[in-house]
């Protein structure tokens, strides 16, 4: 996994993708994966992600996931 991450980071730097954009995309994909794994259940997804349900809900809205 470390090698894949290093390769991805190098590619993003070469493409001049800024840290804010990279972090935003990572967070969005991470949340979407947790929601998919839990069948869209935000309470379960929040537990999987280790965040409070309200925090997850705010991020779902922020990233326009699940129809928001």
Language-model features: locations:
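Bacterial C-terminal helix-turn-helix
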Residues: 3-6, 10-68
